[in-house]
């Protein structure tokens, strides 16, 4: 059974990439979300299901960060994972999702800033994010040199994720950002998790990071994490990806 949907029209794009970080842009973009179909960043559930499901248990308490109008939470419910809480800082889209999935009472929708989540510590077994960090870093002028503000923003989110996970919990991040950009953010010992990376494809080549709370990072990962405010060495042929022909902000946030 597929999620309820109508044909998806091209989204309203911002004039500048940094506007992806502004709630006003998302409120405007989602003003008709209750009547429009889901929009999926970095592939739909089917494209990464084989990677995600082995990390989940039916009884897991799952938190989805920056849910937007994605069908991910509903697809998790259909896949046998009913206990899903989804947050977004746009009250417009949260209200729309509450209406769209009112027939599924186990799905909860909350308006929250992912940098300061209003849940007790240890509330979740799994935290998922798909493109949320990418959007929060949109507008960074140089993907090889993340600003101190950008580093702080990511740290705020990851610190909250670590706080909310139970021992043995999993944080899963789906993104356009390759390891040479993203590992240095994730590989911080204070988060108390291990880190594994793989890829999946949905027309484009995307990255899938899995972190297990209570396990250790490798020595090489810790070394990369120590370089968080320095520039990584660029690969021989950097490849900047787009999520679609319309949304090209990813070319500026390979982080």
UniProtKB/Swiss-Prot annotation:
Entry-linked Pfam families: Methyltransf_11
InterPro entries found in the cross-reference section: Lys/N-term_MeTrsfase_sf (IPR051419), Methyltransf_11 (IPR013216), SAM-dependent_MTases_sf (IPR029063)
What keyword terms does UniProt attach to this protein?
A: Methyltransferase, Phosphoprotein, S-adenosyl-L-methionine, Transferase
Residues at which S-adenosyl-L-methionine binds: 26, 30, 41, 66, 88-89, 113-114, 130
What GO biological process terms does the UniProt entry carry, in alphabetical order? methylation
Q: Where is this motif: Required for methyltransferase activity?
A: 129-134
Write one Gene Ontology MF term.
methyltransferase activity
Which major enzyme category is it?
transferase
The record's listing under Gene3D superfamilies reads: Vaccinia Virus protein VP39
Role this protein plays = Protein-lysine methyltransferase that efficiently catalyzes three successive methylations on 'Lys-36' in eukaryotic translation elongation factor 1 alpha (EEF1A1 or EEF1A2).
Q: Which family does it belong to?
A: Belongs to the methyltransferase superfamily.
Could you identify this protein by its name?
EEF1A lysine methyltransferase 4
| Species this protein is from | Mus musculus
């Amino acid at each position: 059974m597929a999620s309820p949907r109508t044909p998806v029209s091209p989204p309203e794009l911002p004039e500048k990439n940094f506007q992806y970080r502004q709630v006003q842009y998302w409120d405007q973009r989602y003003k008709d979300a209750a009547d429009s179909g889901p929009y999926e960043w970095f592939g739909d559930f089917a494209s990464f299901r084989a990677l995600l499901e082995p990390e989940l248990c039916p009884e897991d308490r799952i938190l989805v960060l920056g849910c937007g109008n994605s069908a991910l939470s509903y697809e998790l419910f259909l896949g046998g994972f009913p206990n899903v809480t989804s947050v977004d800082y746009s009250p417009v889209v949260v209200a729309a999702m509450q209406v769209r999935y009112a027939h599924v009472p186990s799905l909860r929708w909350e308006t929250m800033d992912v940098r300061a989540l209003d849940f007790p510590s240890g509330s979740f077994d799994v935290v998922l994010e798909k493109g949320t960090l990418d959007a929060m870093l949109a507008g960074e002028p140089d993907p090889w040199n993340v600003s101190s503000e950008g580093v702080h923003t990511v740290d705020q989110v990851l610190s909250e994720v670590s706080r909310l996970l139970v021992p043995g919990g999993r944080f899963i991040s789906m993104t356009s950002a390759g390891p040479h950009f993203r590992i240095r953010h994730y590989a911080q010992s204070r988060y108390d998790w291990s880190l594994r990376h793989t890829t999946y494809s949905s027309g484009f080549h995307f990255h899938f990071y899995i972190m297990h709370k209570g396990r250790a990072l490798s020595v090489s990962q810790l070394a990369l994490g120590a370089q968080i405010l320095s520039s990584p060495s660029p690969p021989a042929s950097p490849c900047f990806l787009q999520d679609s022909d319309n949304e090209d902000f990813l070319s500026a946030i390979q982080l």
